[in-house]
Amino acid sequence: MRLLARKKQMKQALDVAQNAIKRWPNNAEMFFLLGSLQDETGDKKAAFKTMEKLLALHPDNYQALNYVGYTLAEEDRDLDRALTLLVRANDLAPNQSYIIDSLAWAYFKAGKLDDALKEIRRAVTLDEHTDASIWEHYGDIAARAGLKDEARTAYQKAMELKPDNAEALRQRLS
């Protein structure tokens, strides 16, 4: 399946993942792979349902906790649940920058700027050189908190890491 996905043969990869789940209906890895493929192909609604099914079967799957929590936060839905899921994901997999970033983003969406700043600063110390989206979130959080220099630095780092998003970030700088 992963080979098919890498070769961008998504329809076949989705079919293989769905058949694997039929054969092994409790396999967490297969559910996560199917949800990830659905997300990658743009079927966010199906991906969310798949991750919810995964959580029903395996409530401590930190990847699914992160996916569902971040999705809820990103869509401004059920922020209390989003925070609960993301705190749990962080407890299960501490020091994972992408989970800490998701937690920071949920705090931001919930209007808890102090908590958001604390967590996003922690996320960038763990992953300062690779993930532009973490730096972009840092910029958004710092800007909302009125920390203009910090926001500028974060947006500039995001532009360095992902130059194709530079124009959108430049607009946030002004």
Residue ranges and their predicted role:
Residues M1-S174:
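Alpha-solenoid helical repeat scaffolds
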